[in-house]
């Protein structure tokens, strides 16, 4: 699927040194991340709300924050892909590094918040009800996230993007 998406949407894929190819690859990875994370958010939010599961709803919010990280990366690629101008004679490539820093900070903050929430649940546990629908949504989520991780890492490695590799 990864190779199919790259071949379908990226022209001249072999020339990753070309700024246009590099930018197109980064944009594709970010858009795929946004779409997958928004779909995961919707599925988990609906199931979490239907079954009253705080953990699934919290995971849905986590997917929404992942989508926002992808949006930050997309903006970084867009700004970083701008050509050199009078005020920036060496181009705008540093924006991609700033986007990578922003994504790293977001991941750190989300990790801390989820850690606090998990600790609160350990201290004050609530009963959990089993649901096949919840289980199916969570298994599908794991599979989608594994694929996304491989896809984004492959694109990041292909174009030597610290931002994508950090995502």
Predicted regions and their residues:
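Alpha-helical transmembrane cores and adjacent cytosolic helix/loop segments
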Residues: 1-167
